[in-house]
Regions:
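Conserved beta-strand in the GNAT
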Residues: 49, 55-65, 72-79
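Conserved GNAT acetyl-CoA-binding A-motif
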Residues: 94, 101-114
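A conserved beta-turn-beta hairpin within the catalytic core of GNAT-like acetyltransferases
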Residues: 65-75, 85, 104-108, 138-140
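Conserved catalytic-core motifs of GNAT/GCN5-like acyltransferases
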Residues: 111-113, 123, 128-143
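Acidic/histidine-enriched, beta-strand-rich ligand/metal-binding domains
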Residues: 83-85, 121-124
Length: 146
């Protein structure tokens, strides 16, 4: 089951678990500095996540169009806890994110900056590459749009 909450509706414990999950994946695994992860945009976003015994198993933030750096609503900070990978959870997370955007934000287009090595996941959901590969925080990315 996926939970979607606007930042202002997150409990302190939920935000702590989200921060911990993002730190483990982005800082520890991918060596991304915290300045490049947390920003004021978090306060304007919806946060979607799944839990197992109060552990974040998957997470993404949904950035409404008016706050997105793209012309569309966007999805970012997509992660799956390393102990829950290789079982389709990332695809389920993205499908639920797309459904939320379509049904609650009434948006039909979504743009994201995909880490290049997982672009096929996004392609399987209908996203198309709309840029060449570029570097973002030392990791190859490609801009994609649904």
């Amino acid at each position: 089951m996926f939970i979607v909450k606007h930042f202002k509706d997150l409990s302190v414990d939920e935000f702590f678990e989200i921060a911990k999950a993002r730190y483990e994946v982005f800082a520890c695994e991918q060596k991304i500095t915290q300045e490049n992860d947390f920003d004021d945009t978090d306060k304007k976003c919806y946060h979607i996540f799944s839990l197992d015994n109060n552990i974040i198993t998957s997470y993404a933030r949904i950035i409404p169009k008016e706050y997105s750096s793209y012309e569309d609503t966007s999805i970012g900070r997509v992660l799956v806890n390393k102990n829950y990978r290789r079982n389709g959870l990332a695809k389920k997370l993205m499908m639920n994110s797309i459904e939320f955007i379509t049904n609650n934000l009434n948006e039909e287009h979504i743009t994201l900056s995909a880490q290049y090595y997982i672009k096929d996941l996004y392609k399987s959901l209908g996203f198309k590459e709309i840029s060449d590969v570029y570097d973002e925080v030392g990791i190859p990315h490609v801009k994609m749009r649904l």
